[in-house]
Amino acid sequence: MKKSKTHALSFYLIAILIVISCDIEKKIESPRIKSYLKIISPNSNEIIKKNDSIRINIISDSKEKSIKESTLLLNKDTFNFKNKINISTNNLLRYGRYNIKISTLFDDGSVENKSKNIFLYPDQKPKELEYELIKIITHDPETYTQGLLIDESKYLIESSGQYGKSFIKKVDMESNIIINKLMIDKKLFAEGITVYNDKLYMLTWKSNKGLILDKNTLELIGEFNYSTEGWGLTTIDDNLVMSDGTEKLFFIDPKSFKINNYIEVYDNNGKVENINEMEYINDKIYANIYGKDIIVIINYKTGEVENIINLEGLLNRENYNTNIDVMNGIAYNLENESILVTGKWWPSMFEIKIKEK
C-alpha cells in the first residue's frame, strides 16, 4: 500500500508540474513582431468615385529604418513606388470592393506586407427613364410571380413561388390558354427562370437546388446545385446569370454549373441589393429590386446601374382588397420591343415601352 501511495503522489506531482509549465508557457509568449509600415491613405474601406485617383501614401513608423522601395498590386496590375503614388481608376472596369496589397522593402533589408480594401463607386447617378403604357393584360392573381419570360415570341413562361404551391406554366399568348403546367416538389420554393439551348432552368429559394426542364413540355430532366440563395435568373451568351438577394450577380456555366465570374452591382450611392427577377435586353440586364416598384438597368460588364425606371402607381393597389405583393416579373417581347411587367399575386400584367425622359 505504501508503494502504491508513493506512485500516486509522484503522478500528482508530475501532473501539477505539467500544469504549471503550461501556464508559464502561456504567460511567456513569443514577442510580437513590430510593424513599421504605416498606410496613411487610403483608409480602410474608403469609397473612391470613378475617375478619381486612388491616393497611396505610406511611411515608416521608425526613426531607425526608412523605406527603400515599394510594390503595389491592384487588380493584377503592379505599380512600383517609394512612399506615394496616385493610381487612376480608369483601368478598373468593375465596381465594388478592391483589395490593395503593398510590399515594402526597408533600408535594413527587412520586408513588410500590408493590404487595404477600397470600394469603387460610379461617379454619376443612374439616369431616369420613362415608360409608355401600351395595354393592360389580365394576370392570374393566384400566381406568385418569380420568373417571367417570352419564348419564341408566342409563349409566356412563368414560375410561381410558395412552399407547397410552387409551379411553372407555359401559356399561349394569343389565346391565353395554358399549354403545360408543372407542380414543383412541395419542399421547394420556385424562383427565377431562363432558357438556354432549348432547356429551361429554374432556381429555388433556399434549397441550393436548381431544376432543368424541357422547354417545350416542362418535363423535369435534371437538377443542379449552388451554394447561395436563388433569386433571379437570366442568360447572357453562354452563361446563366444568377442573383442571390445580395449585390452580386454570378455568371454560371450551364453545363458544369461552376461560377465563371461575378460582378457587384453599384450605383453612385453604393451597393444595390435585393436584385430579384432579371431579363437580358439589348446588352443590358433589366432587374426588379425586391420591395420596390422600379426596374434598374445594369451594365453587366461593370456592375453599374446606368438607368432606373420608376413604375410606382402602375398598379393602383387601392382598387383591390386582395393580398397583393411586390412587383416582380420582366419579360421582353422582341417582336414589338415592349416589356411585360407584373408582380406577385397581381391581377394585372402591363405591357410598356421604355423611352427617354
PLM feature spans:
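C-terminal motif of bacterial Sec signal peptides marking the signal peptidase cleavage site
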Residues: 18-21
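Beta-strand-rich domains and repeat architectures in extracellular enzymes and scaffolds
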Residues: 134-167, 182-194, 343-345
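Surface-exposed, short loops/turns at beta-strand junctions within beta-sandwich domains
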Residues: 89-97
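Conserved beta-strand positions in repeat-built beta-propeller and related beta-rich domains
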Residues: 157-162, 202-207, 242-247, 287-291, ...
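Short, compositionally biased P/S/T/A/G/V-rich stretches that sit at domain boundaries
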Residues: 23-49
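Short loop/turn segments that connect beta-strands within beta-propeller blades
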Residues: 171-176, 214-218, 254-257, 299-304, ...
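A short helix->beta-strand "capping" segment at the edge of beta-propeller domains
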Residues: 122-142, 173-179
